[in-house]
Amino acid sequence: MCIRDSAKGVQAIRFFPKHGHLILSAGLDSKAKIWDVHGSGKCMRTYLGHEKALKDITFWNDGTRFVTSSWDKKVKLWDTETGAVISTVTSGKVAYCVKSHPDDDQQNVLLAGQSDKKILQYDWNAGDVVQEYDQHLGAVNSITFCDEGRRFVSTSDDKSIRVWEFGIPVTMKYIADPTMHSAPAAALSPNGNWLAFQSLDNQITVYSTKDKFRCNRKKVFKGHSNAGYACQVGFSPDGRFVASGDGDGKLFFWDWKTCRIFKSLKAHDKVTIGCEWHPLEQSKVATCSWDGTIKYWD
């Protein structure tokens, strides 16, 4: 299935949590949209409120609400069903990435990685910043929770990876060496043991979340050309495959065990920026691109 979303391009997509019957898209035309992917492929709702291109998007665990960040420097909390904006916050900087806390009881907590090197922790109940994590030396590109939400990992233009205890604004572990490149996208494996990072030297590197966050040198996934784009990386729900788009519009699947390319295909006319596995069906993947389309693969 191919959905033509926006002439300006699609920055990110997210499946509706736990069910995957709908896809939420973040457009470069400033609009968020929700699509019926199991049936008609129709746009069910358009969410208007941002003034510039969207940067990131994240659902709450139950799907009733979602968060958007935009180049207009605003972060918004939306009601998925009614389309109403529940709350808007701004720090005066662009939030490059937004992540809701994974715990069902802490959905009011949001982390936003910013263009000014800071990670801000918002509480939607208070409508304000409750904590600042300020140790990166460049813009923050990704935030990934691990260890059941007790820790999170951030990547930055400063080419480092930092591990934090949630709620404590001091880096617990700092990972950097001269051979490392910037890693603008990351994903946690389904078993929670591994973090995969999209590195800008055209490879996906893997770190353990358990053993002092060491790099697993045996696990490197290559063959794609990300060309400086923050192409999303993801694991299949069973953990057997890793997927990523690339700068040429291709979509790659690697075998987790062997690290070999399992399959690659031409998915889009421009960069395949987003790629999401269906939460229930192993064989289904959705991709989005700056060519303005969302595609649903089986």
Report the location of each language-model feature:
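WD40/WD-repeat beta-propeller blade N-cap
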Residues: 4-10, 48-54, 89-95, 134-140, ...
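WD40/WD-repeat beta-propeller blade-loop signature
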Residues: 9, 19, 43, 53, ...
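WD40-repeat beta-propellers
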Residues: 13, 32-36, 75-79, 98, ...
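Loop/turn segments within WD40 beta-propeller blades
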Residues: 13-20, 58-63, 99-107, 144-150, ...
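Structural hallmark of WD40 beta-propellers
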Residues: 20-24, 34, 44-45, 63-67, ...
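Conserved strand-to-loop turn within each blade of WD40 beta-propeller repeats
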Residues: 26-29, 69-72, 113-116, 155-158, ...
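A short beta-strand motif characteristic of beta-propeller blades
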Residues: 42-46, 84-88, 128-133, 170-176, ...
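Blade-level signature of beta-propeller repeat domains, shared across WD40, Kelch, NHL, RCC1
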Residues: 276-298
